[in-house]
Amino acid sequence: MLFEPPLISATLVRRYKRFLADVVLASGEEITVHCPNTGSMKNCVVPHSPCYLSDSNNPKRKYRYTLELVTTPDGDLAGVNTGRANALVEEAIRAGVVPELAGYQIQREQKYGEEGSRIDLLLSRGEERCFVEVKNVTLAEPGGQGLFPDAVSVRGAKHLRELMYVRAQGHRAVLFFCVQHTGVNLVSPADDIDAVYGQLLREAAGAGVEIFAVRATLGSCEIKLRELLPVVL
């Protein structure tokens, strides 16, 4: 995924009200920007650290700029715009980054399950169906362990139940961790944050739901999922 034009460097002041952040531009001007992330962004929000913004160039938008990348306490980059995760995963699947998911037609946001959900990506090959749910990982612990979720996720638990449901119907079901953190080397459930999700994730794996984690390279010009990581349950 290319950023055209490249992202704009700034300094993060604070993140608040879930969807807002204050930053200081290179000119010294302090502005409020959109922060498209519903999670806690734990270990990602470091006051006075470098960050990167995209420019909508849309004068009708209340907040012209969007927070895209932040610098963590360890100096890594984390991609906090969760709205980009689905497109990154679709791009990676089409590029063959995960061989197990190659050779399918791809549709977005299709209805599925028994709880009124929409799957992020539906892969089709003849009569075969593969349901792919995408989750963005930005929480990292010392040593490179990536954790999900970074806050209690009722919605995430619902999606795991839906994946188990379609797997029981004979379809492939996939949970895809989109790792937008350059310091993450493996992914695990964040049991200390959401024990229910961790338990459900292990149940889902035992029921045949496939789990993949792929780490992105991140920069002001491009984000790209490149490297498969181990998932430790």
Curated annotation (Swiss-Prot):
This is Sugar fermentation stimulation protein homolog. One of its GO terms (molecular function) is DNA binding. Pfam families: SfsA, SfsA_N. Belongs to the SfsA family. Coiled coil: none annotated. PANTHER family: SUGAR FERMENTATION STIMULATION PROTEIN A. It comes from Teredinibacter turnerae (strain ATCC 39867 / T7901). InterPro entries: SfsA (IPR005224), SfsA_C (IPR040452), SfsA_N (IPR041465). It comes from the Bacteria.
